[in-house]
């Protein structure tokens, strides 16, 4: 999982 606030797709 990615950290909070992280946007993989922006």
Swiss-Prot record:
Modified positions (Arginine amide) in chain numbering: 10
* GO annotation, cellular component aspect: extracellular region
Annotated Gene Ontology MF terms? toxin activity
Q: What is the top-level taxon of the source organism?
A: Eukaryota
* Miscellaneous: Has been extracted from the spider web. Negative results: does not target bradykinin receptor B1 (BDKRB1).
Protein family: Belongs to the bradykinin-related peptide family.
Primary role: Causes constriction on isolated rat ileum preparations and relaxation on rat duodenum muscle preparations at amounts higher than bradykinin. Is a partial agonist bradykinin receptor B2 (BDKRB2). Has insecticidal properties. May be related to the predation of insects by the spider webs.
Q: What is this protein called?
A: Nephilakinin-2
